[in-house]
């Protein structure tokens, strides 16, 4: 359960980071 939740958080974090880089690039 924790691993699945962590993977989900990492995916969301990656997407948010990519969006932020795109917005500020």
Swiss-Prot record:
GO function terms (MF aspect): toxin activity
Keywords: Antibiotic, Antimicrobial, Membrane, Secreted, Target cell membrane, Target membrane, Toxin
Source organism, top-level taxon: Eukaryota
Tissue expression summary: Expressed by the venom gland.
Subcellular location, record wording: Secreted; Target cell membrane
Family: Belongs to the ponericin-L family.
Function: Membrane-perturbating peptide with multiple activities. It is insecticidal, since it induces reversible paralysis in insects (L.cuprina) after 1 hour, but fails to kill them. It shows moderate antibacterial activity against some Gram-positive and Gram-negative bacteria. It is also antiparasitic, since it moderately inhibits the larval development of the major pathogenic nematode of ruminants (H.contortus, IC(50)=23.2 uM), but fails to reduce the motility of adult males of the other nematode B.malayi.
Name of the protein in its database record: M-poneritoxin-Nc2a
């Amino acid at each position: 359960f924790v691993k699945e939740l962590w993977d989900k958080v990492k995916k969301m974090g990656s997407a948010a980071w990519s969006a932020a880089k795109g917005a500020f690039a």
